[in-house]
Amino acid sequence: MRSLPSSFTRKLRRQVAANDRVSQLIPDPVNAELHVDSVSYQWPNGHHSLNRCSLTISKPGLWMLVGSNGSGKSTLFRLVTGLLQPQVGSIYCQRSSALVFQNPDHQLLLPSCGSDLMLGIRPNQSMDQRRKKVEALLNQLGLHGLAKRPIHTLSGGQKQRLAIAGALASDARLLLLDEPTALLDPQGQRTVLNTVRELCHDPVKPITAFWITHRLDELSQADGAAQMSMGRIGPWTSGPELGQRLQFGRFSK
C-alpha cells in the first residue's frame, strides 16, 4: 500500500479505525467477523482491481492473504475500512477495523510511544483512564515501560508493534495488516507475527487479524490462508497446504 500523508493518517486513525461499519453497509447476512459479497471496484483509469470478489472470515483468528502485486489486496483493505466504497456488491464487518501499514513510520505521528497511543484513544475517556489504557497496550505488545521512549529510538519490530498497539487503542477488533513484516529482519518478523497470533488467540478477548503477506513462510502460523488473483480470492485452506502449493518463497514485487 502506498504511503499516506500524515494529516490523512491522523484522520484515518481517529475516525476510520474505530468506525462501526455495520450501519454504513448492510444488515448482518451471516454470523461472520467479515463478509465480502461479490464486490467489484474499477479505478478511474479503467483498471478492474476487484472482480466480484467474495470472502468470509467466520471467527477470530489469524487469516492470511497472498497474491502478486496488482491482484487487488490493498484495494480490498481500503474498501473494508471505508476509504473506498464498493461499486458493486456489499461488505459487512461485525467489528470495528483498523489498518496497520507496511511501514510503521507512516503511521506513528507523535514523538513518544505514549503520546502516539493517546492519539488513537477515544476522547470521551478521562485522562487517568487513557494513561492506564496506554500502559496496558504497551504491556500487551511487549513494550512495557516505554511510554516516554522517543519513537525514533525504537527498532523496526518495536515500531511495528507500537503501530499495532495504536490500532488497538481505537478499540478496533479487526486488524487489517498490509505486509506488516516486509521491512523487518527475521527476528523482528518472528516477534511481530507471534505477537499478532497471541492477540488472535487471547482466551478472553481474541481479535481478528487479516494479514497480507508475500512471505510464504509466514503461512504456517495462519488459522486460514487464501490466494488472491485477478481481483478474486480463492477458497480458504490451511497455511502450510497453500505454502506447499505455491512452493514457498516470495512473490515478485
Q: What residue spans do the PLM features occupy?
A:
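Helix-to-loop junction immediately C-terminal to a conserved catalytic motif
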Residues: 81
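Conserved beta-strand-loop-alpha-helix hinge in the C-terminal portion
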Residues: 232-253
